[in-house]
Amino acid sequence: MSAPARSARLGVLALAMINVASIVSARNLPVMAEYGWSMLALFALSILVFLVPISMAAAELGTAFPREGGVYAWVKEAFGGRTGFLAVWCDYAENVAWFPTVLSFIAASLAYAIDPSLATDKTYLVVVMLVFFWGTTAAALGGVRASSVIGSVGTIAGSILPALLVVGLGAAFLLRGDASQIPFSAGALVPDVQLDDLAFLGGIILLFTGMEMAGFHARDTRDPGRTVPRAIALAVAVTVTFSVLGSLFMAFVLPQHEISLVSGTMELFSSVLHTFSADWLVAPLALVVAIGGIAHLTPWILGPATGVSVVAREGLAPARLGRTNRNGVPVALLVVQGLAGSVFALLFVVVPSVSTSYWMLSAVTAQVIVAMYALVFASVIRLRYTRPDVPRPYRIPGGLPGVWLVGGVGLLGCLSSFLLGFVPPSQLATGNTAVYVLLLALASVVLSLPPFAFALLERRRGRAVAATAPS
């Protein structure tokens, strides 16, 4: 989505809401709801090892290097164009696996407006996913302006509204006096530390991706040193509140062993509305959520692809990837994205469980995106050495030890998330462990490989040109 005009300077609240709009969603709440009360300890751990470090790193980089390009510009400044391209490619590639998770949420929500049993029908899910995926891809060909208008409406109806409803209906359920599905006890707060029980923790990063958005808009504020850190702090508070309350209320209402990772949000709506004898509201609400989800998806179809096309025009990728239509849309990248996303969507047909398919795609998404975040943490450390004289309106406190602590903890969080993604979760039937791990590893490698392949081809082309040049 396009940045605001330079004359429209952003304040703390406006900048914070940009972050909140890009992060808050009810779609990923079922993952943490599976943990019951122990989710509180896991949330605290994730906030400490990822959310706080990435927020601080984005605040420093965004205010020190407030230029267009975001993560690409930061990583390029630290490690050069090739590594910067790897970072922006990871942002593009992770969307290929992420799109089917959003589309499955949309399809499952729409099922509650037609027939709730369709939410577990694989054929229905895949057909609806592909129709909406290519439909939104076609809409994205209209350019950034069209995508931004659609996305503004979709962000509210597709992400923020469902999250608000999860919290509101969950609270209404408890205030009515209904019994919680997870009775409180001190022991329930302690998570099981078996690896297969902690596997979902690898995907919690998806609840917090996007916190770097405030850093992207640092140049659109009057006083980045004050505005960006405060906006990030406010966005963190709002995001954590929604995520924790939403996950808790879902766990209160739905039995843990019955929570679907795909349709858990609509299951909560249906269950609570039934207790209030308001079942008639389920279908129209499902329709609003589904339409909002489609609208929310549209700008994301275009955004990362546009970033890759800009880098391609700088000569760091094949020139054809940088070609655009009259609306400035990189058609080739959208087609490749559509074909690859469609292949990933077919996982819902191959894997026995809908929830397992959803989780595998979420795990691949997390594994690819943590590579980008790891580069951000490495960049904030390296730039303290290579560009120490650049003014930093916001500086991670503690000097070099402080930036090493924040960056080091963030890198550790990224590594942990990456490795946990390969562990089959005990909450799901994943089949043969070796096949599960192999599929995830293969998907992650295939999605991350192109930048290295492009670099190798360019190196060989350079050698060929040098060999044929007259001496």
Name these PLM-found stretches:
Residues 40-41, 118-124, 153-286:
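Helix-loop-helix junctions that connect adjacent transmembrane segments
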Residues 1-5, 73-76, 103-127, 161, ...:
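Helix-loop-helix connectors at the membrane interface of multi-pass transporters/channels
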Residues 1-58, 65-68, 184-185, 389, ...:
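Membrane-interface "cap" regions at the ends of multi-pass membrane proteins
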Residues 73-74, 80, 112-117, 231-298, ...:
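TM-loop-TM module centered on a large, flexible mid-protein loop between adjacent transmembrane helices
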Residues 168, 364-372, 400-471:
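A generic transmembrane alpha-helix motif of multi-pass inner-membrane proteins
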Residues 6, 150-153, 157, 320-327, ...:
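C-terminal membrane-solvent junction of multi-pass transporters and transport-like membrane proteins
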Residues 124-176, 232-237, 362-375, 402-409, ...:
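Membrane-interface loop-to-helix entry segments
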Residues 34, 52-133, 137-141, 290-310, ...:
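Hydrophobic transmembrane alpha-helices that form the core helical bundles
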